[in-house]
Amino acid sequence: SCGMGERALLDVARRLDAVAELVGDLSVLEPVDGELWPDLWAGIPGTARLVKTASIPSDAEELDGLELVRLPSHDEMLAVPRAYLDGTVRLERETHQSRRILAQPNGDRTVLLMPPAAPLTTEELDGLYALPFSRRPHPSYKEPIPAVEMIATSITTHRGCGGGCSFCSLALHQGRRIASRSEASILDEAKRIAAMPRGGSISDVGGPSANMWGAACRLDPSKCRRDSCMYPSICKGFSVDQRACIDLLRDVQATPGVKHVRVASGVRFDLALKDATALAAYTGEFTGGQLKIAPEHCVPDVLDLMRKPGMKPFEAFLEAFVRYSEAHGKEQYVIPYLMSAFPGCTDAHMRQLGDWLAA
């Protein structure tokens, strides 16, 4: 599957169950008629599958009742690097709102990518996160995993990101529409973490962008053709109550057995600047010395290609962060994520970034 996979996996399981009823009791070693499979997997949103290239007429404009969009072939991308970029742009445009099938040939085989599955509802997310996950590494891992303790005590509040940054896979996996868990579900998870050995400190609370819990579109998202809810400016239809996010964090902090709650990364700084009260709380109450955020670069031409806000809001955020940290008697630091070698970023751009860091 592609995307988060729960709906696709459920659909696959139901179809396999139907096959079992059709063919009767079989040993796992007995072959099943191969003619069943091509039709069995057709039309499942959020999946990719391989078919024979010859099975798709060269002039076909539709498949499985949906419009067919052809991407540059694998061989074309190897021969002409620009084709890889063109294919990536087409893929991204179709992933968010598409009801079309994407096809990419590779010799005698073609990958078919179905339209994305719908995001899970709040009730479905709550049911998923209520499952008894062990929060331990898979037994196949023999060596220690450095991040495992941090991950084991973190809480996902929502999926999706309105940022739509052009380099980021999160919106491709989870979509730009925010799907949020209920406060009750999040607090139940906080209780379970608090009951764990050394579970008193919750390392991170949030999602792809930490301050988008509960966000929604006030307009009609089915008609939206924007690449980003945030760029070039925050869409007037993007609605989020950041103070509700702060109230949620305070309720998590008040959970019996919880000693510390942190938002360690992912605060969208241009959005945070829209609510000074919430930003002061993120900084003073829920930052544990360091906050990781993602300006990615400092050169306007590169930031435009990335669909990132300019340096003016980032520097305004830094000033506010220092001011609110000092007001709470804390010495804290912002750790910036920065990117090199982005398509369109030149050596001269990187020298400008180096000069900015050194200043």
What do these predicted ranges mean?
Residues 2, 114-118, 151-158, 172, ...:
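Hydrophobic alpha-helical scaffolding
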Residues 141-169, 194, 203:
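N-terminal pre-triad scaffold of radical SAM enzymes
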Residues 1-106:
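Glycine-rich beta-alpha loop elements in corrinoid/cobalamin-binding modules
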Residues 128, 161, 165, 186, ...:
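Conserved, mostly hydrophobic/aromatic
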Residues 192-335, 339-343:
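Conserved SAM/AdoMet-binding glycine-rich loop
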Residues 85-154:
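N-terminal [4Fe-4S]-dependent radical SAM core
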Residues 172-201, 251:
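Conserved alpha-helical substructure of the radical SAM core
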Residues 277-278, 342-358:
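Catalytic cores of alpha/beta
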